């Protein structure tokens, strides 16, 4: 049976794991690393790079390098958070045809789901290379606080990448699975997950194979990227004070500052001070300018203190929803690379009143949990029951623009809930159902997921018709809604598609694009391999021609030289098939040369043997003389 892989699709890095016997195993990528940067780059030559190769060239290609796209997934272009991001990233964020935030590169628009699919394809290929077989099914993780639009967009990304997404699972829940799989005694744990772009806090009761989420809360626009950008702003401001030059308008300089910020942040987790040294960061009439400064851990902590404190309110809300006090939490599990920061650990310790558990790898534990869930769905992992919750309340807009909740936040999923509503006017023959997700009291302050009309209601006084609205949330946290006129039996049912999200036709087109691109990538790789083989063949043939050219006829020599020239011309072109054909031609005409080499080699071997025999005779004579002397 084909394996189900678990993928942690992260803002900064992604990770893939698979069940190996009873344990989840993280798979190394082609560069030998256990995590892959969630970065996609489009080069001037039309090549697409994913992961470490894309990240490596970011400084020289800032506008063509897309990173942290997870922060845009499932978001509208006019979302305030998108506005904030537009000012911080060097690549173009544009309005998609459906009103969502998309990215643009070299005049072509890509949805965040498409970019995410490219990263997922890389993870899929990593797993296939390790397993030696095709992978078609996956469990993909998302932040617990992702809304329906963001979950649906992530599922779409999986489909575009050629994966059947068996389950969308919350990141803290996945981490809890990996942490608690072998724990039999009952515990109440809090999973504090601060990653590259999002923050989640989940409270769970675990024990004897049951993982029950009691509550979850978070912030989908708070993570390591914000810490990096805070440092970038500080570096740029300090440089402006010293040199009078604003680096914020220079995309190349900004990319270098971002890399320096990320490096400084990591170094300050283990040391008290670090030095930022960026020579030739810019230039003016007086010549090149260099950026050199020292940064202490204390200064860094003061710069980001408000970001650290922003994680506390969700923690308070999650405990309140779970009906618990901080002291009733048995263990706090840290997840996400940012939790390596000493200040974060200090704040967590202070809030919960206990040292956090550090026995799991914060970069890998989520992918491992996803792999375990894949094993559960496949039947390989027995006696595990996972009870997750919906992070946000769901409801509809009712008279006066009020948000009427049908399903409260932190309700265990899957779940189904119905409620009967009526008309607001006499003889009203249609109703518009507007579906929202959020916690505000007025509908328009929440996230509009979808709207649809139920028509054909028989004329009647207001308040008489009975319209039954049913919400159904599946195990992925994805919503289906139906409205039914109980008088006529007329029903309208929809699967919520993110307002402005990708239609089935959009997804189908993107799947085709991805397949074509995979074919292009394969063709490009084959072209590179053919070029390498051709250059090696030219080199070896020219070398052999120099050494053994006098052993073949002039005509044969000319044929080989012509074939070499033709192959070199083919290498100047772009057709790998022509290169292959010219290689075969060169190999054919070089056969005589190979024969001459073989004959020369045989003759040399025969001479060597003769020399060896005469040497043996001399040795024998020497031995006999020695014997006589004795």
Curated annotation (Swiss-Prot):
Which Gene3D superfamilies does the protein's record reference?
Answer: 1.20.1270.10, 3.30.420.40, Actin, Chain A, domain 4, Substrate Binding Domain Of DNAk, Chain A, domain 1
Which CDD domains does the entry link to?
ASKHA_NBD_HSP70_HSPA9
Q: Where is the composition biased (Basic and acidic residues)?
A: 515-529
> Which pairs of positions does the record mark as disulfide bonds?
none
Output the InterPro entries linked to this UniProt entry: ATPase_NBD, Chaperone_DnaK, Heat_shock_70_CS, HSP70_C_sf, HSP70_peptide-bd_sf, Hsp_70_fam
Annotated region (Disordered) at 515-535, 600-630
Q: Does the keyword Ribonucleoprotein apply?
A: no
Swiss-Prot/TrEMBL keywords:
ATP-binding, Chaperone, Nucleotide-binding, Phosphoprotein, Stress response
Role, per record:
Acts as a chaperone.
Q: Which family does it belong to?
A: Belongs to the heat shock protein 70 family.
PANTHER family, per database record:
HEAT SHOCK PROTEIN 70KDA (PTHR19375)
Give the protein name, as stated in the record: Chaperone protein DnaK
Q: Could you tell me which species this protein originates from?
A: Bartonella quintana (strain Toulouse) (Rochalimaea quintana)
Q: Which gene encodes it?
A: dnaK
């Amino acid at each position: 049976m084909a394996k189900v892989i678990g993928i942690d699709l992260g803002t900064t890095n992604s990770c893939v794991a698979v069940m190996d016997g009873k344990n989840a195993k993280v798979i190394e990528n082609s560069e030998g690393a256990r995590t892959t940067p969630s970065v996609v780059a489009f080069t001037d030559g039309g090549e697409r790079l994913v992961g470490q190769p894309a990240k490596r060239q970011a400084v020289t290609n800032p506008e063509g390098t897309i990173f942290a796209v997870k922060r845009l997934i499932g978001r509208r272009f006019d979302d305030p958070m998108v506005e904030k991001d537009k000012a911080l990233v060097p690549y173009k964020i544009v309005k998609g045809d459906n009103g969502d935030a998309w990215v643009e590169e070299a005049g072509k628009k890509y949805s965040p789901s498409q970019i995410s699919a490219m990263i997922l394809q890389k993870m899929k290929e990593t797993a296939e290379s390790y397993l030696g077989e095709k992978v078609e099914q996956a469990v993909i993780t998302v932040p617990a606080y992702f809304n329906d639009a963001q979950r649906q967009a992530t599922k779409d990304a999986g489909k575009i990448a050629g994966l059947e997404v068996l389950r969308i699972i919350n990141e803290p829940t996945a981490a809890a699975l990996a942490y608690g799989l072998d724990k039999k005694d009952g515990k109440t744990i809090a999973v504090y997950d601060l990653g590259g772009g999002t923050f989640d806090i989940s409270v769970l009761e675990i024990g004897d194979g049951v993982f029950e989420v009691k509550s979850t809360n978070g912030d989908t626009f708070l993570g390591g990227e914000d810490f990096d950008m805070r440092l970038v702003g500080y570096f740029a401001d300090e440089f402006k004070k010293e040199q009078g030059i604003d680096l914020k308008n220079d995309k190349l300089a900004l990319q270098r500052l971002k890399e320096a910020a990320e490096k400084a942040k990591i170094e300050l987790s283990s040391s008290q001070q670090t030095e930022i040294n960026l020579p030739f960061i810019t230039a003016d009439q007086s010549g090149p300018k260099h950026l050199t400064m020292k940064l202490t851990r204390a200064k860094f902590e003061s710069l980001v203190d408000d970001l650290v404190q922003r994680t506390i309110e969700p923690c308070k809300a999650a405990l309140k929803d779970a009906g618990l006090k901080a002291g009733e939490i048995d263990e706090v599990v840290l997840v996400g690379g940012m939790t390596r920061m000493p200040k974060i650990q200090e704040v967590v310790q202070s809030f919960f009143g206990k040292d956090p558990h550090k026995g799991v790898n914060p970069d890998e534990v989520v992918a491992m949990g996803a792999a375990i869930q894949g094993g559960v769905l496949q039947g390989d992992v027995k006696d595990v029951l996972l009870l997750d919750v919906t992070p946000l309340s769901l409801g509809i807009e009712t008279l006066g623009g009020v948000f009427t909740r049908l399903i409260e936040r932190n309700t265990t999923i899957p779940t189904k809930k119905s409620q009967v509503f009526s008309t607001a006017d006499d003889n009203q023959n249609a109703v518009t159902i507007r579906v929202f997700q959020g916690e505000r009291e007025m509908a328009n302050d929440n996230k509009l997921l979808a709207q649809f009309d139920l028509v054909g209601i028989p004329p009647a006084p207001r308040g008489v018709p009975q319209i039954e609205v049913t919400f159904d949330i599946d195990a992925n946290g994805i919503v289906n809604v139906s409205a039914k006129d109980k008088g006529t039996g007329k029903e309208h049912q929809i699967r919520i598609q993110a307002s402005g999200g990708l239609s089935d036709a959009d997804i189908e087109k993107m799947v085709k694009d991805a397949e074509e691109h995979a074919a292009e990538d394969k063709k490009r790789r084959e072209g590179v391999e053919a070029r390498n083989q051709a250059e090696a063949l030219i080199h070896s043939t020219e070398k052999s021609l120099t050494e053994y050219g006098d052993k073949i006829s002039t005509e044969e020599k000319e044929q080989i030289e012509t074939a070499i020239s033709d192959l070199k011309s083919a290498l100047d072109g772009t057709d790998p098939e022509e290169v292959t054909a010219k290689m075969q031609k060169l190999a054919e005409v070089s056969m005589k040369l190979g024969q001459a080499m073989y004959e020369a080699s045989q003759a040399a071997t025969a001479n060597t043997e003769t020399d060896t025999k005469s040497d043996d005779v001399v040795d024998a004579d020497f031995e006999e003389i020695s014997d006589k002397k004795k």
